Every structure is written in C-alpha cells, then in structure tokens.
C-alpha cells in the first residue's frame, strides 16, 4: 500500500510503498482510509516535540492518528488509528468508531474531529459549562478556536468573548457566534482595559486557553481579587502556542475562586472518552452535516505529502489529505 512514512524525527514524511497493517486482535479493525487532517499535534508528534511522541521504528512509521475510513461493509466512519492513518489501509480501535452522516464530506469530518476533542472536552468536562455562562476563548482565530466559539454557543453560553491576532479571522468569528472580539496586537493596558469593559454586564466564568504565555498571564492576573466574594472562574489550558511557561502570583489562587486545569491526552477519564465517541462526536458531526457547525478545509492528495507538510495554512483552515 502507499503511505506517508517518517524514518527519523523531524524529517519530512515520504510517499512510499509500505506493508499493509494487520489487525492484531478482535478489538482492531482493518479499514480503507479516505481522509486525514494534518494537525499541529501530528506535526509535533512526528518532530518529537509533543509529550506523547515516540521514536520512529527502524523500518519507518506511518504518521497520522485519526481520520475518515470505510469498513468492510461499506460503512463510512471516523476512527482512531492503531497503526498510522496516512495510508491506503489502517487498523483502528473497534470501540472508538463513529458512524458519519451520509451527506457530511470526508474532509469536513476528518478536520472537525480533533477540533471537537480540543474544545468540547474542555468545555464540557473541565469547565463544566452551563447555560448562561460567559465564556472567554483565548486564541480563538485558529481552527480549533473557531470550533470552540461555535460549540460554546451550542452549549448555551450567554456571551462568548474571543481573542486573537489575525484581524480578519477575528472579524470572521463574529459571524460564527462570538459576541465580542479583543485583539492581542494592542498594548497590554489597552488589552486589559477592553477585557474589563467586556465584563461590565457579567463576569467571565469559563476561559478556554489555546495560547498560554503572556496573554494567559494577563488574563489570570486581571482576575486577582481584593478579598471580597468572587464568581467561580474555570480556566482550562488546551494549548501553549505562545509559550510553555507563565508567571502566576499565588495571590491569584487565594483571592479568587479559580479552578486552573488542562484538557488533553491523559487528563480525561475512561468514562469521558466513552462519552466523546458515543455522544459528543456524533452530535457534532450531525451539526456539521446540518450546516450548524462550520469549518474550512484545504484538500491535498496523499502523494504530495512531502510538498505540503510544511504548507503555511491560513488561520482558521485545516489541511486535509485525501486518499
């Protein structure tokens, strides 16, 4: 079979002939792959930068962890790979499969899944979002951030405040459900002043953060209390695009009802992952099929994997490899 394979961490994937995988037990299924999204996670893992990275096997390793595929009976599903997914054939986990709506495109389904995982899991299980919450999404102009804005609204957020640097992408977020946008290109004082004004009619209760770094420091610092009663703030770290470390005053933890947590591989319970596949993903795929959850994709062919691996994709779009 043809596949995208890496032989050394950090090298470009190669389009080569590779042995077809074999299901090792009854919990695995051999499938034909149709579409796989290329995410920051995939690039980081292939380069050895992600905490879940492993050293490629000596004879090469197929990359890609999830995607749209077809079962033996012709059913089209989203699945999580046991073997790498950027190949004509792959093995997937039998209990981590979601049947796809008939009119949902392969590219949309492939692109949407990881963004749902990177937004809905944090909103639902880490932030415990409730109808009427005011939600701040820090770094909302990226692909997952755009999905997070829409899902927060779907879950009943009264107001969604979105931050980001790309001016056009920030404007686009208003059409996707954001009620207010705040640019990260302005000075610190201006940013903090706008953040304060955005909460005059109700304080932020949920913060989904894709950036970490200085903007997270400012947001957390602005929440510091003065000894009076405060509303509960659930701050959920999902990404660290602008830095892996921050400075946080201990007073932030003592002076405000702050719940500081993260959402990612290793932070969810087995029950939460089961709900992801049995409830959350099916619901979100259906919303996308109905035109109520919107994403933008760029489709490329597997044979061009080396040429497009480092392609500069615009904010809010996802690269999808079709097979």
What is the predicted function of each stretch?
Residues 228-239, 247-292:
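Rossmann-fold dehydrogenase core element
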Residues 85-87, 165-174, 245-250:
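Short, glycine/polar-rich helix-capping loops at beta-to-alpha or helix-loop-helix junctions
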Residues 176, 180-258:
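Glycine-rich cofactor phosphate-binding loops and adjacent beta1-alpha1 units
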Residues 21-42, 47-85:
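Glycine-rich beta-strand-centered segment in the early N-terminal region that forms part
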Residues 112-187:
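Mid-domain Rossmann-like dinucleotide-binding core that forms the NAD(H)/NADP(H) cofactor-binding site
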Residues 63-66, 76-139:
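NAD(P)H dinucleotide-binding glycine-rich loop of Rossmann-like/cofactor-binding domains
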Residues 271-323:
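C-terminal hydrophobic helical "lid"/dimerization subdomain
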């Amino acid at each position: 079979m043809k596949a995208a394979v890496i032989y050394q961490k950090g090298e470009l994937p190669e389009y080569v002939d590779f042995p077809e995988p074999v299901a090792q037990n009854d919990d695995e299924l051999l499938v034909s792959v149709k579409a796989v999204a290329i995410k920051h996670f995939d690039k980081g893992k292939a380069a050895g930068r992600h905490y879940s990275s492993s050293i490629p096997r000596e004879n090469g390793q197929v990359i890609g962890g999830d995607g749209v595929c077809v079962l033996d009976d012709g059913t089209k599903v989203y699945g999580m790979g046991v073997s790498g997914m950027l190949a004509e054939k792959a093995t997937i986990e039998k209990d981590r499969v979601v049947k796809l709506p008939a009119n949902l495109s392969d590219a949309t389904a492939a692109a949407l899944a990881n963004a749902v995982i990177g937004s809905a899991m944090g909103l639902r299980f880490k932030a415990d979002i409730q109808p009427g919450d005011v939600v701040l999404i820090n770094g909302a102009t990226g692909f997952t951030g755009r999905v997070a804005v829409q899902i927060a609204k779907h879950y009943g957020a009264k107001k969604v405040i979105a931050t980001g640097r790309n001016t056009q992408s920030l404007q686009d977020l208003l059409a996707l459900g954001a009620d207010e946008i705040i640019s990260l290109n302005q000075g610190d004082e201006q940013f903090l002043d706008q953040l304060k004004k955005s909460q005059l009619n109700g304080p932020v209760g949920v913060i989904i953060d894709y950036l970490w770094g200085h903007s997270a420091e400012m947001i957390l610092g602005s929440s510091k209390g003065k000894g009076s009663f405060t509303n509960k703030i659930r701050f959920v770290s999902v990404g660290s695009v602008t830095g892996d470390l921050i400075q946080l005053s201990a007073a932030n933890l003592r002076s405000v009802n702050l719940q500081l947590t993260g959402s990612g591989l290793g932070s969810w319970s087995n029950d939460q992952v089961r709900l992801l596949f049995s409830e959350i993903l099916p619901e979100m795929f259906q919303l996308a099929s109905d035109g109520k959850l919107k994403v933008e994709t760029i489709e490329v062919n597997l044979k061009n994997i080396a040429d497009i691996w480092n392609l500069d994709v615009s904010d809010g779009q996802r690269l999808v490899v079709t097979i």
